[in-house]
Amino acid sequence: MPSHFVSPTPTLPLPAGWRPVDLDARAVRALMTARAGGASQPPYDTCNLGDHVGDAPSAVAHNRRLLADHMQAVPIWLTQVHGNRVVRLSHTPDPSDPDVITPVAGGAPQPHADGSFTTEPGLACTVMVADCLPILL
């Protein structure tokens, strides 16, 4: 791993199968999760992050907190719809632009979009994939 790569949270051991993505970029961090390491019961065992598949909401909330703790960032989740909308994540609201998404205490409705980007530290562009290929630019 390059010496300038910063693991999401070096002080917390990653659950089995979770891997930091080795990027040659000073300001970009990435993490790929696996099914192990969470609180979900079968058939979602154990680290299900999807709140749309019928898993217990408390288990999904626990798993998402675990991920946020490891990332040391606020994950912004999308409702992915196989469309062409890309949203910008920001700490500062922009009421004139519906494609600017800000974190809200206690959670917020997940925007319907298939991509996100940010230039601000502390925000995580978060996507879930099953049979799709995630792209990080």
Task: Identify the residue ranges that each predicted region occupies.
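Active-site microenvironment for binding and transforming phosphate-containing groups
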Residues: M1-L137
